[in-house]
A protein has these predicted regions:
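Conserved ATP-binding module of the ATP-grasp superfamily
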Residues: 127-130, 150-153, 164-199, 221-233, ...
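ATP-grasp fold ATP-binding core
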Residues: 121, 144-166, 184-201, 213-217, ...
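A conserved helix-loop-beta module that forms one wall/lid of the active-site cleft
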Residues: 94-163
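Peripheral (often C-terminal) accessory segments that flank ATP-dependent C-N-forming ligase machineries
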Residues: 313-400
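ATP-dependent carboxylate/phosphate-activation module, predominantly the ATP-grasp catalytic core
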Residues: 191-257, 261, 268, 272, ...
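Alpha-helix N-cap recognition
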Residues: 136, 167-171, 346, 383
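ATP-binding N-terminal substructure of ATP-dependent carboxylate-amine bond-forming enzymes
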Residues: 1-106, 138, 321, 383-399
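Glycine-rich phosphate-binding loop signature in dinucleotide/nucleotide-binding domains
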Residues: 69-76, 145-147, 182-183
Length: 400
């Protein structure tokens, strides 16, 4: 089996995917823009060959790289980056080289555009917040009048909180439409939801059924975290509620999420709202057909005592898991600190106090630090009370 892994060097933990594929007997070929000599030794040992391109945005270069591998190794069976940024290019390469193990260009829209995602959530019988897409400020005002303030605007094709706006009144909404003009149609307007994000994460088989699934919770608004108003904090829950599992499995079927990682996002309402539901009810938010970002895959591993990189590689090579799934169910949390801020408990003291619970304390590159923090702490706990005590110690600021 020939597997072309796109950008195997970034994110930095993605060498694990290549390593597990190779362990399963897969011929792993890499395409990236990093010089070969800068690749980690563990990645080099997992790759049969690496083709460096000057610019991964240049599709002609990517075609030449794929053509080279096809000529040298025969038909390519898989192309995957497991990276949101390259999903559309992955699909285009599959289309051009007739690779049938993943989604092609004609279908990629449902994995990228939020407005299209809403229709697939509806197909799965999953409620969502009300929304509209328009470049007409009058229509936008009418929508806001219907759903009430505040109103959220997000890029229809985008990920995370990048480019997200929160309008508290008509003046702010009008200013946005004046600035954007016709480009406002590239945004989706949504009613505001007071909820925490809960996810359905895992690996799906060729029938869009989960081989393994877990869930993590982000109590604070992603937009507030991204804008620096709230610290990075989220955790893997030890169990998935029956309602969330039912919705997650229905969404996988509706979206046709076959043979791939999935990261499905839902709102769990903090307060009741007549148009949405009661506190605790779950709404569909958006889908990401790749692993959750940052160190979440590692956190899922720590929480469950498994190797999700290996489970994914088993799916690729064998269509099912050939290695153990979760051996236990713990909380695993991630807290992020920013270098420019002071915290009540110094770094070294935090490391010492929680040395038996800490799984990792990585520094983040600048490209990720703005949203997540410069310094992360990943720790596992048997119970929620111990985890919340860690949160207080990790994130508490000095008293004024």
């Amino acid at each position: 089996m020939n597997f072309v892994f796109i950008s195997p060097h970034f994110p930095e933990n993605y060498w694990n995917f290549c390593d597990r594929l190779r362990a399963n007997g897969v011929n792993v070929l890499g395409i990236g823009d990093a010089p070969y000599e800068t690749l980690p030794a563990l990645l080099k040992s997992a790759l049969t060959e690496y083709y460096r391109v000057d610019n991964m945005e240049n599709y002609d270069e990517m075609l030449r790289a794929m053509g080279f591998f096809t000529f040298k190794y025969g038909k390519i069976d898989w192309v995957e980056s497991n990276n949101e940024y390259w999903l559309e290019q992955d699909a285009r390469l599959r289309t051009d080289f007739n690779i049938t193990t993943g989604i092609k260009s004609a279908e990629i829209e449902k994995f990228k555009r939020k407005s299209v995602m809403k229709t697939y959530y509806q197909k799965a019988g999953i409620p969502t917040a009300r929304w509209c897409v328009t470049a007409d400020v009058t229509e936008a005002q009418a929508f806001a009048k219907t759903v009430g303030w505040p109103v959220i605007a997000k890029p229809d094709n985008g990920v995370g909180a990048n480019g997200t706006h929160k309008f508290k009144n008509k003046t702010e909404l009008n200013k946005f439409f004046q600035q954007e003009g016709p480009s406002a149609a590239n945004y989706i307007l949504e009613e505001f939801v007071d909820g925490e994000i809960v996810t359905f994460d895992g690996v799906a088989d060729a029938n869009a059924e989960p081989i393994y699934a877990a869930s993590h919770v982000t109590p604070d608004s992603i937009m507030e975290i991204a804008h620096g108003k709230k610290p990075m904090w989220y955790y893997v829950a030890p169990e998935i509620s029956p309602e969330l599992r039912k919705m997650g499995e229905a969404a996988l079927k509706a979206f046709g999420a076959k043979s791939r990682f999935f990261h499905l996002e839902f709102f769990r309402l903090k307060t009741a709202k007549p148009s949405l539901g009661n506190a605790g009810d779950i709404l569909g938010l958006e889908v990401n057909m790749r692993p959750a970002g940052g160190y979440t895959v590692d956190m899922l591993n720590y929480a469950g005592g498994l190797d999700l990189y290996q489970i994914w590689a088993d799916m690729v090579a064998f269509g099912a898991a050939h290695h153990p799934l979760a051996r236990y169910h713990r909380y695993c949390c991630c807290a992020g600190r920013h270098d420019e801020l002071r915290y009540r408990m110094p770094h070294e003291e935090l490391l010492k106090k929680y040395r038996s619970c800490l799984n990792a304390a990585p520094r983040l590159p600048e490209v990720l630090a703005r949203e997540m923090g410069d310094q992360l702490y990943i720790a596992s706990f048997e119970d929620e009370a111990a985890m919340q005590a860690f949160r207080r110690d990790a994130l508490a600021r000095p008293r004024e």
